[in-house]
Amino acid sequence: MKVVFLEDVKGRGKKGEIKEVPDGYANNFLIKNKKAEPATGKNLGAVKGRQKAEEKAAAEALAEAEQLKAKMADEKFVVEVKGKSGADGRLFGAISTKQIVVALAAQKQIKLDKRKLLLNQPIHALGYTNVPVKLHRDVVANLRVHVSEG
């Protein structure tokens, strides 16, 4: 029996795939547990429509990420973060990804998840720092962060 997988099934198929499986397995496990549906004309059309919608959404997300990367590449695109520091220019604490994301949202109206910032360790010094930001699976941008005395 040909079925269209609605979700990934280990060892059998991935979501959206159309495969031939034994009748008993299809009826008693896959269809019963809503992991697959029979590959009829109506179901195939629905799967194709879902795949097109997913591809369109992925393309839009990629285009949006590319646009944001271009905006961040501008020299004037700098996020200002203030911190207390000593005489030698070292901070009394550190600037974390959370502080950078909050400043980015306040100053540039761009909301990002703090896990998107690929900062190995918090910033401990005054001055400019380039922070890599993973905007999309295929798009990584550099965000300039200026830490100043505050």
From Swiss-Prot:
The keyword Ribosomal protein applies. InterPro entries: Ribosomal_bL9, Ribosomal_bL9/RNase_H1_N, Ribosomal_bL9_bac/chp, Ribosomal_bL9_C, Ribosomal_bL9_C_sf, Ribosomal_bL9_N, Ribosomal_bL9_N_sf. SUPFAM superfamilies: L9 N-domain-like, Ribosomal protein L9 C-domain. It comes from the Bacteria. GO terms for cellular component: ribonucleoprotein complex; ribosome. Pfam families: Ribosomal_L9_C (PF03948), Ribosomal_L9_N (PF01281). Keywords: Ribonucleoprotein, Ribosomal protein, RNA-binding, rRNA-binding. GO terms for molecular function: rRNA binding; structural constituent of ribosome. The keyword Ribonucleoprotein applies. GO terms for biological process: translation. Binds to the 23S rRNA. Belongs to the bacterial ribosomal protein bL9 family. This is Large ribosomal subunit protein bL9. The lineage of its organism: Bacteria, Bacillati, Bacillota, Bacilli, Lactobacillales.
